[in-house]
């Protein structure tokens, strides 16, 4: 007499879903993500198809062709794009939970900051287009409040605050690519404030009374690693010629970081065949920030804490930006671009979560890369392989 036994198929998709927020299906129902679906109305299959699109660098057409042949998900690429838009608020919701659980939040209690950034997206193939994707995320709640798509090359497409709408009281943080007088002046005229890494060749500094600001002589007064100082300064609005008050905040790097900075200068000298000046070597011994944030609310220590926090956030975004550079934009419409961005960020955080807890291994029975290095690229390969393997096991028998 044969005893009854259960027989189940545990796919790598089950492994991946185990790292989703616990109540993600209930959240999906609350967001009504399947509203209007006409063909495949399975939540898991739709999510699986979207994850393949977001993580594997496929176009919507390639994704739906692959999922249709495997029997996983039967729908058109147009319908999948509409599902992506519907899933956008769900990805946003889950991003907030994952991000808050993995990262230290704002250094100022109750303070919201806008992180401004851009990245180039090269669509695959010999005729693939290259775009520059400008986006703004509010932190710590991880809400995308603006996106803009431009050509990667041409006039007016570089990193600039002028690509973004600014509201009175906005506090923006950005890297040195945004350290330009016209962009900072634009934010100031709109009633906003900036905190940017100084690009000393792109921004002319003045004293509050309009004289030349002697940055080098100021920096020479900081002699100890970890020592920080600030000075009042101003920049000039290129349009009105009016002075915009601000501060220079500088902290001297550790001796190890200074050695690395000098080494980088030497590499630039070899690569570009020019000799950096002594002033360039000195400036690279410091982290230098220009800010228009209010001094009373944002003293020197707080400005440095904000920059340190922004640097930590940038590390968290590193994988996210590498995923943004991989794949096809769904459309050039902001609604679908935002959903695409939220989905990419969710994939990045999911991989980060797997790496953090399991060092990239999904399960004891599905660890096919033990002999490889544990680098970021291999983490992504594991994730991609798990998604594709999960598609393979759904292929119907003939």
Name each model feature, range by range.
Residues 60:
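Helix-turn-helix DNA-binding elements, focusing on the entry/boundary residues of the two helices
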Residues 89-103:
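Short Lys/Arg-enriched helix C-cap and helix-to-coil transition segments
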Residues 71:
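Short edge-strand/loop segments of extracellular domains
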Residues 113-118:
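Long, charge-dense accessory insertions within large macromolecular proteins
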Residues 1-57, 65-66, 75, 79, ...:
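Single, function-defining residue in the core of a domain
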């Amino acid at each position: 007499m044969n005893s009854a036994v259960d027989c189940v198929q545990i796919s790598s998709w089950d492994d991946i879903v185990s790292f989703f927020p616990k109540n993600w299906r209930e959240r999906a129902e609350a967001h009504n993500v399947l509203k209007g679906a006409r063909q495949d109305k399975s939540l898991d299959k739709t999510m699986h198809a979207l994850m393949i699109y977001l993580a594997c660098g496929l176009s919507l057409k390639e994704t739906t062709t692959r999922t249709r042949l495997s029997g996983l998900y039967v729908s058109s690429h147009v319908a999948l794009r509409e599902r992506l838009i519907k899933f956008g608020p769900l990805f946003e919701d889950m991003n907030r939970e994952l991000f808050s659980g993995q990262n230290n939040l704002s250094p100022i209690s109750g303070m919201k900051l806008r992180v401004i950034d851009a990245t180039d997206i090269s669509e695959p193939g010999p005729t693939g287009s290259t775009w520059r994707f400008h986006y703004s995320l509010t932190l710590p709640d991880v809400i995308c409040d603006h996106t803009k798509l431009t050509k990667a090359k041409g006039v007016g497409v570089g990193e600039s605050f002028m690509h973004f709408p600014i509201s009175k009281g906005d506090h923006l943080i950005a890297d040195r690519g945004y350290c330009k007088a016209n962009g900072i002046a634009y934010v100031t005229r709109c009633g906003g404030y900036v905190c940017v890494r100084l690009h000393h060749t792109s921004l002319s500094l003045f004293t509050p009374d309009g004289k030349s600001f002697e940055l080098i002589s100021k920096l020479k007064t900081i002699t100890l690693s970890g020592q920080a100082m600030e000075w009042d300064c101003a920049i000039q609005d290129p349009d009105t010629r009016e002075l915009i008050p601000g501060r220079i905040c500088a902290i001297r790097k550790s001796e190890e970081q200074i050695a690395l900075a000098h080494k980088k200068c030497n590499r630039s000298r070899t690569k570009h065949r020019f000799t950096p000046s002594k002033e360039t070597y000195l400036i690279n011994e410091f982290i230098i920030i220009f800010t228009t944030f209010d001094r009373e609310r944002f003293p020197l220590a707080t400005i440095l804490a904000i920059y340190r926090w922004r640097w930590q956030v940038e590390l968290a975004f590193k994988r996210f930006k590498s995923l943004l550079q991989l794949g096809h934009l769904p459309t050039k419409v902001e609604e679908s671009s935002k959903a695409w961005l939220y989905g990419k960020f969710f994939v990045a955080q999911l991989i980060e979560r797997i790496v953090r807890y399991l060092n990239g291994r999904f399960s004891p029975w599905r660890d096919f890369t033990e002999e490889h290095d544990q680098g970021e690229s291999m983490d992504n390969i594991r994730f991609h392989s798990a998604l594709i393997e999960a598609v393979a096991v759904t292929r119907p028998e003939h």
